[in-house]
């Protein structure tokens, strides 16, 4: 028995030693963090003030663009350092070291797509000095915050660099046009997709949240008061790496913008400057091609191209994966590259992927040039860079110009092959090398109707029918989408049906709560209404409720809960390509859920649909694919907690004299992570009430509304007026 005890003790000691060895060896293999004193000293080169308005929104004011970028990095870190840190770790391929195995696929994709080979090779050659100075200043702001708050910093993060910002664009932008869906097709049915849902935006999951948005521009000719108006209304997750943060930047070098920012980026991604503005929505062109490779049966390290065997380019991806606590294991996986692009080996063979934007580090440059454009010509010059590989753009400016672009880095492809299918991988003439010029992209400028819109729908419905683009004018090789959304139909039925849009109507139409009779939802709803209820009392009652439903989603509506809980799962399954359940089964599930949790099958929609933040719980109207977009996550009590949809909303107006005003609202507030802050949820009541607040764009507008005025690292000084530069 004594020998058994000694043996067991020895085994424990060996295991403990192995764990200690893994922990120590992993830490030794990582570079030493920089001296915090050096990061703090770097801050001395910047002259900037952060002025928080009464909603906590930061206004960053400095003499140079670099000063403002530094202040933005610091201010955003004050409110959401955890997410900025997560973004940096993800784009470096280091997320699994903190998040565990669920993030290993993301880390592998960073290697597979050669994110850092691209950034390191092209950062200095392809990005001008003025931009690099801004990128590095933003990174200095993040580092300064981290140095002052070392307890919040994950080991290995520092220093954050300008290259991290660039890598974020290089890695993330292809997922906005559906690269993840193409990867999913190549994996097993049990595989996942890169999710855009909240804090898990970089993790593999098979239940991504819907991506949707609205953008509308109205010209003076269609406005009752001769104004030019722009709606900025992206539907995003409420939290996480692709959630919106509001700020105003004001540089003495002309970088003066207000709008929405993502964690880890110094640039306004959509919003306005003094002269012009734009809104983005996600589009769905075919920008990814998949090639089935012929692998040498005698040598798995080769593939055939034009009758010759070529060697795969091979490298090793070392992925550090958190196992438990501080224990990190280094996993290794082979990375293959062919002439077409990255290679994935699956049970069905080896496939190469070629996608728009690969190898391009210039998205940051395009965003910076868009931010500083002073007129339509400069803005279009920035768009001609074609470095942002997708997204719809709806534009408006102080001169009354409006426009719509179905933006994309469209490959120049041969006519004939089925580019939306799997292509033969042994023909080099199917490997495209260039993009369709910007001026050949689908776009509409200053149409006779005086309005343009997009709600993730086809570009062939973007204005009044007489001014719409024609499908026959574009090559099928562009892969332009032809689908419509409910929001697209409702835009046509509201903005498109009103020849003289007032300021009030422009606002009211944005908060439209109805499903169009032409929508997919209405078609599925018709299937549900056709269910034979027979003698089933529940089905008969449900049929009566649904028959009287007006297809609206007001908080007091007593048909919306039953209808949406029935039709939304059916639509989701069909969109996902899954075998949908029978409508009667979906209806029975909705009935059971509502009876169990609410004691009736016709509760008010606001009892079910909730906006929650900390201890706050508010009824909210709207729903899936509604212009007032709200996507909820089912809770154990049967309610839905809004997780995505309407978030940061902005209304921009230039009156007929060109004077700018704008209003905005955020679903929560500027304090992303601090529940003790008064700005953690102070905008939520306004948000659910469809109200907005003024954007204090100029120093004169901001004066008298300043809650805090400080240099980075010196917060606490209260001011009542604007600070000088």
Regions found by a protein language model. Give the residues of each.
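C-terminal/peripheral segments of proteins
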Residues: 2-527, 532-535, 541-725
């Amino acid at each position: 028995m004594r020998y058994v005890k000694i043996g067991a003790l020895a085994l424990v000691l060996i295991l403990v030693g192995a764990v200690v060895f893994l922990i120590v060896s992993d830490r030794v293999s990582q570079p030493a963090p920089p001296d915090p004193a050096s990061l703090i000293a770097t801050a001395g080169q910047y002259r900037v003030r952060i002025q928080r308005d009464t909603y906590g929104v930061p206004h960053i004011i400095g003499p140079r663009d670099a000063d403002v970028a530094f202040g933005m990095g610091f201010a955003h870190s004050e409110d959401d350092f955890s997410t900025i840190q997560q973004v940096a770790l993800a784009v470096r391929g280091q997320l699994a070291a903190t998040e565990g195995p669920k993030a290993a696929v993301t880390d592998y994709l960073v290697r597979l797509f050669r994110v850092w080979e691209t950034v390191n090779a092209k950062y200095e050659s392809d990005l001008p000095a003025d931009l690099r100075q801004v990128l590095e200043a933003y990174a200095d702001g993040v580092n300064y915050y981290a140095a002052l708050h070392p307890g919040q910093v994950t080991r290995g993060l520092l220093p954050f660099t300008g290259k991290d910002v660039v890598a974020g664009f290089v890695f993330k932008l292809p997922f906005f046009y559906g690269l993840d869906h193409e990867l999913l097709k190549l994996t097993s049915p049990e595989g996942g997709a890169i999710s855009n849902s909240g804090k898990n935006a970089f993790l593999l999951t098979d239940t991504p949240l819907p991506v949707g948005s609205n953008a509308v521009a109205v010209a003076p000719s269609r406005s009752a008061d001769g104004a030019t108006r722009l709606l900025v209304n992206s539907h995003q997750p409420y939290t996480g790496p692709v959630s919106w943060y509001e700020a105003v930047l004001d540089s003495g070098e002309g970088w003066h913008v207000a709008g929405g920012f993502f964690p880890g980026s110094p640039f306004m991604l959509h919003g306005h400057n003094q002269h012009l503005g734009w809104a983005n929505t996600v589009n769905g062109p075919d920008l990814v091609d998949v090639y089935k490779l012929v692998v040498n049966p005698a040598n798995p390290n080769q593939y055939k191209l034009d009758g010759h065997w070529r060697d795969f380019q091979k490298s090793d991806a070392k992925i550090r994966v958190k196992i438990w606590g501080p224990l990190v294991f280094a996993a290794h996986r082979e990375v293959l590259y062919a002439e077409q692009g990255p290679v994935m080996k699956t049970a069905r063979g080896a496939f190469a992927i070629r996608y728009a934007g690969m190898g391009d580090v210039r998205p940051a440059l395009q965003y910076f040039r868009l931010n500083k454009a002073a007129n339509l010509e400069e803005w279009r010059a920035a768009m001609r860079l074609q470095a942002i590989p997708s997204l719809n753009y709806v534009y408006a400016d102080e001169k009354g110009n409006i426009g719509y672009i179905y933006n994309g880095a469209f490959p120049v492809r041969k006519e004939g092959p089925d580019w939306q299918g799997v292509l033969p991988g042994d023909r080099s003439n199917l490997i495209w090398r260039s993009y369709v010029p910007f001026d050949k992209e689908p776009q509409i400028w200053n149409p006779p109707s005086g309005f343009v819109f997009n709600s993730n729908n086809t570009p062939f419905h973007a204005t009044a029918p007489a001014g719409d683009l024609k499908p026959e004018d574009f090559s099928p090789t562009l892969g332009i989408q032809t689908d419509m959304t409910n929001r697209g139909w409702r835009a046509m039925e509201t903005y498109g049906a009103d020849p003289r849009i007032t300021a009030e109507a422009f606002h009211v139409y944005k908060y439209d709560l109805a499903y169009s009779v032409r929508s997919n939802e209405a078609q599925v709803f018709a299937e549900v209404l056709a269910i034979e209820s027979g003698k089933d009392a529940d089905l008969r009652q449900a049929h009566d409720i649904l028959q009287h439903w007006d297809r609206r989603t007001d908080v007091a509506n007593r048909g919306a809960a039953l209808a949406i809980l029935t039709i939304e799962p059916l639509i989701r399954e069909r969109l996902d390509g899954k075998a949908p359940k029978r409508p009667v089964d979906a209806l029975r599930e909705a009935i059971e859920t509502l009876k169990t949790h609410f004691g009736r099958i016709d509760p008010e929609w606001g009892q079910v649909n909730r906006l929650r933040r900390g201890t706050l719980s508010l009824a909210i109207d709207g729903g899936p694919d509604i212009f007032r977009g709200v996507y909820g996550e089912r809770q154990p009590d049967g309610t839905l907690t809004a997780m995505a949809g309407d978030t940061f909303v902005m209304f921009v107006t230039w009156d007929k004299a060109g004077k700018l005003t704008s209003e905005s609202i955020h679903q929560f507030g500027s304090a992303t992570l601090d529940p003790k802050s008064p700005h953690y949820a102070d905008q939520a009541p306004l948000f659910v009430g469809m109200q907005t607040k003024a954007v204090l764009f100029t120093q004169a507008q901001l004066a008298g509304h300043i809650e805090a005025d400080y240099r980075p690292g010196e917060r606490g000084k209260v001011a009542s007026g604007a600070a000088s530069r």
